[in-house]
């Protein structure tokens, strides 16, 4: 709400003038540093109509013209200033605006706001806070679009990591040669990555299908888009990290595609709003939901209700509501994370074994809270690790070998060394200058 970039309505042209008033109002923006392509950006700025502060609104701003040159009044830092390790993916830059003229249509006002012919601002919304969140809703679909960009790479990464575990030979002390997947810890970590990735994709797909018919007009759209951004993206990040770690050095090579996907995940996690404040906003919305919308008659569903009631009571009892909300930040994050994961479970469809594995992991994560609220006994919590290991072994046995076909990525796997049936031969084919010894055996 401290947005300093300003845009002023110009009665003479019925347009706007966008301006960066001081250094602290400069923006970090993606897709803008490199020349050669036309580029536009959605810029959030404080709208002034005369002397009236009309709140934060989105504006569509042409930044580079058809030749890729900067538009008049737009200045950006050179590509080497923001030295991101993945510069080739998103060309971030620092950007400022100096009296940039915008046409009337650049104002993404929706149906809630207008400026009359006499230069008077009108809004159906009651406060600047409502205006701000209405403005955010105008670009909320971006959270889903960005999340969707991760799914192909996530599927390929899971298929590659599982394939590597099945193909990588280990020489045991007794002379036997066994695959890496023979080690229970390794395959269970990968299976957990697999079910976590499926949960993330189910959350994204379920919420997308819920809102496609009505666009952004549902009262829950902003909260649901936040769940995708704050929960689905972070679940994908966890899954990708396991994939890269379980492939060792092989997982870090760019040509094996896992590392670039993890880098992209990092970018998505901070685009369209950083995941943590988005999760906090989701938690605040959840506090107002009716009980019946979350009551699924399970220990985790009951836990969500109890955490919510407890937080509402603490906020109601507080003299300083804002200070109380800040003090409850960790609890709010746990509430939002639990709500997002429960939503993912609902969208996993008929895959009962996948849902069971996800639920057992979630119960382990929330074991202290389940015990505190008396929703599980100590004996039930103590039995969870062994139960989950058995569930993960079942999922590995019945699904792991079919992951490349389930995700339809065999052609993509074939383009990577990790996806080759003979890893050593794949690398030697890429390095003809190497002395090639006789194949093993």
Residue ranges, per PLM feature:
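Flavin-dependent oxidoreductase catalytic core characteristic
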Residues: 1-441
């Amino acid at each position: 709400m401290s947005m300093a970039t300003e845009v002023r309505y110009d009665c003479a042209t019925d347009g706007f003038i966008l301006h960066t008033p001081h250094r602290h109002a400069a923006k970090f923006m993606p897709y803008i540093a490199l020349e050669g392509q036309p580029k536009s950006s959605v810029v959030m700025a404080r709208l002034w109509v005369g002397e009236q502060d009309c709140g934060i609104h989105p504006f569509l701003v042409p930044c580079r013209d058809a030749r890729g040159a900067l538009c008049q009044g737009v200045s950006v830092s050179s590509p080497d200033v923001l030295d991101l390790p993945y510069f080739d993916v998103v060309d971030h830059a620092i950007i400022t605006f100096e009296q940039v003229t915008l046409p009337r249509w650049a104002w993404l006002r929706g149906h809630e706001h207008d400026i009359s012919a006499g230069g008077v601002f009108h809004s159906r919304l009651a406060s600047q806070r409502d205006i701000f969140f209405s403005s955010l809703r105008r670009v909320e679909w971006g959270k889903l679009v960005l999340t969707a960009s991760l799914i192909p790479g996530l599927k390929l990464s899971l298929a590659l990591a599982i394939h590597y575990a099945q193909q990588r030979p280990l020489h045991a002390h007794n002379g036997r040669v066994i695959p890496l997947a023979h080690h229970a810890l390794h395959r269970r970590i990968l299976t957990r990555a697999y079910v976590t990735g499926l949960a993330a994709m189910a959350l994204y797909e379920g919420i997308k299908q819920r809102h496609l018919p009505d666009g952004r007009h549902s009262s829950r759209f902003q909260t649901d888009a936040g769940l995708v951004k704050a929960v689905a993206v972070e679940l994908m990040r966890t899954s990708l990290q396991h994939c890269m770690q379980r492939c060792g050095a092989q997982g870090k090579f760019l040509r094996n595609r896992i590392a670039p996907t993890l880098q992209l995940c990092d970018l998505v996690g901070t685009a369209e709003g950083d995941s943590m404040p988005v999760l906090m906003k989701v938690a605040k919305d959840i506090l107002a939901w009716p009980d019946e919308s979350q009551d699924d008659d399970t220990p985790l569903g009951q836990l969500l209700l109890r955490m919510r009631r407890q937080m509402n009571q603490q906020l109601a009892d507080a003299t300083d509501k804002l200070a109380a909300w800040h003090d409850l930040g960790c609890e709010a994050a746990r509430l939002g994370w639990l709500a997002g994961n429960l939503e993912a479970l609902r969208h996993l469809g008929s895959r009962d074994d996948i849902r069971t594995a996800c639920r057992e992991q979630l119960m382990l994560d929330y074991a202290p809270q389940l015990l505190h609220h008396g929703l599980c006994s100590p004996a039930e919590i103590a039995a969870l690790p062994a139960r989950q290991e058995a569930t993960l072994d079942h999922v590995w046995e019945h699904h792991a070998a079919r992951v490349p076909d389930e995700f339809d990525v065999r052609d993509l796997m074939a383009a990577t060394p990790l996806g080759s049936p003979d890893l050593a031969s794949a690398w030697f084919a890429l390095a003809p200058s190497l002395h090639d010894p006789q194949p093993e055996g």
